[in-house]
Amino acid sequence: MIDIGKVVNKRIGELEVVCRELTVGRLRALLAAAPEMDVVRDFLFEDVRLGDLPVLTNLSIEQVEELPPSALSLVIAGCREANPDFFGMLARLKRPQATS
């Protein structure tokens, strides 16, 4: 497989975080993944579950758990920059649907 997606690098202190653009197939798998609900993991941020960050970045789940929300917000900004179409789709899905 050829790696042709966009990459955004973010420095969080001494940590170099690589935010990757995902393929359509990886995005579909990410949305389909439905682990047991965890309030903090699933709802701390509006558009990203904490468990999604290891897929979107080079961070391990252990590294994600050790970062404060302010640092994770910077990581998520990099993920948004690398995946604008995906986050645009999420925003469109949240809009109220017109009823006929």
Tell what function each PLM region has.
Residues 2-100:
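Short, surface-exposed, charged amphipathic helix/loop patches that serve as local interaction elements
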